[in-house]
Amino acid sequence: EALKGDDQLAISEAVVRNFIADYFTWTNKDGNYEVGGLQYIYGPMFTSFQEQSRWEFYKDLDFYISQYGRENLLEVSDITITSSAVAGNFELYSGEEFASFYIETTWNYKPSPKIDVDSFQKTGYFTVINNNGRYEIAQFFDHYD
């Protein structure tokens, strides 16, 4: 729906929703090597983000699959945009600047009989950039200080 118009904020919100649905859902993953949502990450950060994810959020995925079965793992059930705004230019480490959008979100997981889904991340603070018409996540955090 967002892509039918040219509302950059709505497009950025859609990117974040799709990222959350793929990255934080484990029921469709075969192992910790299969990091979801990478297509929404700023291109030059792709490899480092994938590696960091495998050592952090995905580090125990293989164990969870073998102990509890993939069907009993995390599956995002709903996503709420709690705040969004045009954020001005965002400067990357390379010195490049891009138009950016700030998105705050919360989400929930389907209940699981095997794991405590409430012990996993359920909030995110995202910066989305317009990289020559391609909307990409340049950074995100699980808490805001």
Locations of regions flagged by a protein language model:
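Exposed beta-sheet edge and beta->alpha loop/turn motif
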Residues: 82-145
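A short, amphipathic edge element
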Residues: 65-89
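Generic local-structure boundary detector
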Residues: 26, 30, 34-37, 49-53, ...
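Core segments of small alpha/beta cavity-forming domains
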Residues: 1-72
